[in-house]
Amino acid sequence: MELLNATLAKIYGLDKEAMVKAQAHQDILIKPQGSLGKLEAIVVQLAGIQGDAKPKTAKKAIITMAGDHGIIDEKFHNWPKEVTVQMLQNFAHGGAAINVLSRQVGARNVVVALGVATPMAADPNIINRNIAPGTNNMVHGPAMTREQAVKAIEVGIEIVNAEVKKGLDLVGTGDMGIGNTSPSAAICSIITGRSLEDVTGRGTGASDEQMKLKRNAIAKAISLNNPDAKDAIDVLSKVGGYEIGGLAGVILGAAANRVAVVVDGFISGAAALIAYTICPQVKDFMFAAHQSVEPGHRILLEHMGLDAILKMDMRLGEGTGAALAMNIIEAANRIQHEMASFADAGVSEKQS
């Protein structure tokens, strides 16, 4: 807990003075005040995070964390667990959707194995921080120990701290793990208080019969483990996943370093919910990249008071939505840096 506690102690609110200056600059640009809508709000929030009315967005990374899940033993999933490590290898060598979208926005990919079940060969492009070969089947007991849950969070903090040392203005979260919509639905239901019917989606394409099995399995896991909704680490340890804990650590670590976090879809959202329950202040550092088609994603975003930048009917994960949203965030910041003011352009201002 030492690293986690030290990280939490470094998190404080937005720089209001920088935000006022950023908004004042927006108000003198050659446009009606407020006419760029959410683009203006984005850059003002960025200013508050970085403490600079002209924030930076050049140095970007997407951290994609992977873990397997014991609940796939319940036989309602369409894909074998081996796919997790196979996709990790694709991430590491540039062939996946997240690689394409990261290249497009100029973000580096950071690929982390945190709880992968299938043995894998050493790869210089994969950071192997495996805590265990996947979670235990939460239908029969806790997914992991409390100590392992804390370790997952602290690995996430360590990973983002290392990226900050390389230079980091924006960090996106991404995930990979067969079966990880189940723990995400469990986390969402427990913390928001919404029913499993409300928050559970089809994941990678579950049939109606698979959906019944999925909801029943998650309900059994929650009933058996009885997690404390107010104790995020208890929730994570009993019904979570290693990659979810790691991404929660990325979010907390980024906030401690005054780095904006672009949160991807449902699994990243579950990680954000864990981080938010530990430290509500982290909301100030998060941008919700998009609203996934997973129904629980909208619910957890509403719980945290976050508005999604995009709505693209996506449900892939990996950090793909985060990479896309970085384009919007960078565009907002370019307006702040490059657009002319009324005085610069010789344009008459609105008459009072």
UniProtKB/Swiss-Prot annotation:
Biological or metabolic pathway of the protein: Nucleoside biosynthesis; alpha-ribazole biosynthesis; alpha-ribazole from 5,6-dimethylbenzimidazole: step 1/2
Keyword Glycosyltransferase: yes
Residues in coiled coil: none
Active site, renumbered: 318 (proton acceptor)
Catalysed reaction, written as an equation: 5,6-dimethylbenzimidazole + nicotinate beta-D-ribonucleotide = alpha-ribazole 5'-phosphate + nicotinate + H(+)
Pfam assignment, any one: DBI_PRT
InterPro entries: Nict_dMeBzImd_PRibTrfase, Nict_dMeBzImd_PRibTrfase_bact, Nict_dMeBzImd_PRibTrfase_N, Nict_dMeBzImd_PRibTrfase_sf
Protein name per the record: Nicotinate-nucleotide--dimethylbenzimidazole phosphoribosyltransferase
Annotated organism of origin: Dehalococcoides mccartyi (strain CBDB1)
Designated gene of the protein: cobT
